[in-house]
Amino acid sequence: MDKFSLSHMSVWQGRQDPEDGELALRWYDKVQAWPLSGTAEPGVALVGFACDEGVRRNKGRVGAAGAPLAIRKLLANSAWHLTRPVYDSGDLTCDDGDLDAAHARLAERVASLLDEGHFPLVLGGGHEVAFGSWNGLNRHLVGQGRVGIINFDAHFDLRRKVEQASSGTPFFQIAEQCTAQGTPFHYACLGVAETANTQALFARADALGVWYVKDEAMSERSLPALLSGLDSFIAQSDHIYLTIDLDVLPGAVMPGVSAPAARGVELAIIEPLIAHIQASGKLRLADLAEYNPNLDQDNRSARVAARLVHQLTK
C-alpha cells in the first residue's frame, strides 16, 4: 500500500447508546479497516486523497489536505443506516509536491478497488483529485463502454495545463487523454458560476461539447428539467463518474472551501440529483473535493461533507 496510511483509524469513535442495541449503531461501529491481506466482501471503500498541491499551484488557499481526516471525524458519529460494508483503505499523501506521482498512486488504488468489486469513494483534497480518480476508472474499464463525468462545481476546471497540472486543469487533462486514446469526452458540469469562469473557459466548454448548467438555473422550479437533462446524459453513458466540488454549494452553507460561492446551488437541489444518478445503476466511482477545514466555521462544512458521504454510500 504505497504511501497509504491507516494510522487514522483512531478517529472512528463517537457516542454510545447501549440501551438501544443494534439499532443505535453509528458509522464508527461499522467502518472496517482495509484488510492488509486476503480479500474483502464487496462494499464501499473510502480512500483519502490528502493533497492540496493542485490548489497551491492554482493560487488557491491551501488546507484541503486535512479534509479526509476532518470528514471522517464528523462522519464517525453519524447514525448508521447502510446495508453494505464500508472499509477505510487509508490516505494517500503528496508531501513531496509530486502531483503526477500522487495521481498515479490514486489511479492504481481506485483501479484495484474496482477490480475487486468495490465502490470507491475518494475523499479529497483539492479538485486535482479528479484526474487520479478518473484514471483509475479508465484503467479498470480498459475501453469497455462510454464514461460520463458528472461534476457538481462552480468552476469548469478546464484550464490548460501550461506547465503543471493543478486543481483547475483536471477535466482538460481528461479531455486530452480521451483524444489520445480515441474515446469520447462526455462531461457535464452543473452549478457553473458565470462570475467564476472566464469567456475563454466557456468557449472551451462549448468546443469540447460540455453539457453545463449555470448556478442561477438550478432551482426547485427547474428540478424536473434538470432531471430530464440528467436522463439524456446518462442514457449516452455506460458508466458514471460523479465528482462533487463542495464550492458548488452556497458560501453560507459551505464556508470551508478555497473559493466560497456567492450564490451556489442549494443542497436541496443537489441531493435529489445525486439520488437520480444513483438510481441509474451506472455509478461506478465518486469523490468529494475542496473541503478546507482551516476555513470552516463550527464544522458546518464538514457536516455537509459527511452528509454527502452518507448519501453516496446508500
From Swiss-Prot:
Asked if the keyword Protein transport belongs to this entry, the reply reads no
Catalytic activity, per the record? Answer: N-formimidoyl-L-glutamate + H2O = formamide + L-glutamate
Q: What does this protein do?
A: Catalyzes the conversion of N-formimidoyl-L-glutamate to L-glutamate and formamide.
Q: Which GO terms describe its biological process?
A: L-histidine catabolic process to glutamate and formamide; L-histidine catabolic process to glutamate and formate; putrescine biosynthetic process from arginine, via agmatine
For this chain, one GO molecular function annotation is: manganese ion binding
Question: Does this entry carry the keyword Metal-binding?
Answer: yes
**Entry EC no(s):** 3.5.3.8
Binding, Mn(2+) 1: H127, D153, D157, D245
What domain of life does the UniProt record list for this protein's source?
Bacteria
Similarity remark: Belongs to the arginase family.
Task: List the PROSITE patterns hit by this protein, alphabetically.
Answer: ARGINASE_2
Task: Name what cofactor the protein needs.
Answer: Mn(2+)
Q: What class of enzyme is it?
A: hydrolase
| Listed InterPro entries | HutG, Ureohydrolase, Ureohydrolase_dom_sf
One of its Pfam families is Arginase
Task: Copy the pathway line from the protein's UniProt record.
Answer: Amino-acid degradation; L-histidine degradation into L-glutamate; L-glutamate from N-formimidoyl-L-glutamate (hydrolase route): step 1/1
**Where Mn(2+) 2 is bound, by residue?**
D153, H155, D245, D247
Record-given protein name = Formimidoylglutamase
Cofactor notes: Binds 2 manganese ions per subunit.
Q: What NCBIfam families does the record point to?
A: hutG (TIGR01227)
Keywords assigned by UniProt, alphabetized: Histidine metabolism, Hydrolase, Manganese, Metal-binding
